[in-house]
Regions:
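Membrane-proximal helix-turn-helix segments that form the acceptor-binding/catalytic region
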Residues: 74-78, 131-154
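Short beta-strand->alpha-helix junction loop in the catalytic core
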Residues: 114, 161, 180-182
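Active-site proximal beta-strand in glycosyltransferases
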Residues: 86-88, 101-126, 176
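Short N-terminal targeting/anchoring amphipathic segment
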Residues: 76-94, 107
Length: 182
């Protein structure tokens, strides 16, 4: 209504959006669906490099969605760059976001670094075996830090987030802008 149009790219479960927002569905292998969480896709379901990324990362014990989704989003956006002036990444921070940033101006919102979640889970882990599993699962966090350090525009939602992101991800404070939620 203010002269701009918003489009969203999303994977399962697909978001319910305002009717004025056009959704481009980026189907995944849906490994984390509610009915069959952790299902292993059959080989004939692997139809793209994104699918291969998703299943191999998951098979290695890593949360695969950020990398696989960012790759799918890049492939979808690459064919439609003329339609967009700006891309807003909401904390995916997969390597595909760096590729998107090369073809379209990109801003990232970081609510808080997942390093905080990882640190809390590691502290609560009862034994070394569980800590190894947690470290593997959060393997994507290193990628998110690398991507965040290379993105020029980062929106954060609190002063605590600025402190955590700067400390844990090595992002220069001068590239973060505080925008309160609400």
């Amino acid at each position: 209504d203010l002269g701009h149009h918003v489009a969203a790219f999303g994977g399962q479960p697909y978001p319910v959006l305002d009717p004025r927002v056009r959704l481009t569905q980026l189907p995944s292998l849906d490994i984390f669906n509610d009915l069959y969480p952790g299902r292993m896709p059959a080989f004939w379901e692997l139809k793209s490099l994104s699918d291969l990324i998703e299943v191999t990362q998951y098979s290695a014990g890593t949360f695969s969605e950020p990398l696989a989704f960012s790759h799918r989003a890049y492939r979808a956006l690459k064919a439609r760059t003329a339609e967009f002036d700006l891309v807003h990444d909401n904390q995916c921070l997969g390597y595909g976001v760096l590729a998107i940033n090369k073809i379209l101006p990109t801003v990232v919102t970081l609510h808080h670094p997942i390093t905080v979640d990882r640190r809390l889970e590691m502290a609560a882990a009862p034994n070394w075996h569980k800590r190894i599993s947690i470290a593997r699962w959060y393997g994507f966090v290193k990628m998110q830090g690398r991507v965040a350090r290379r993105i020029r525009r980062i929106v954060v939602v609190s002063e605590n987030s600025i402190d955590d992101i700067s400390r844990d991800m090595g992002v220069d404070r001068s590239r973060m802008r505080l925008v309160h939620v609400g």
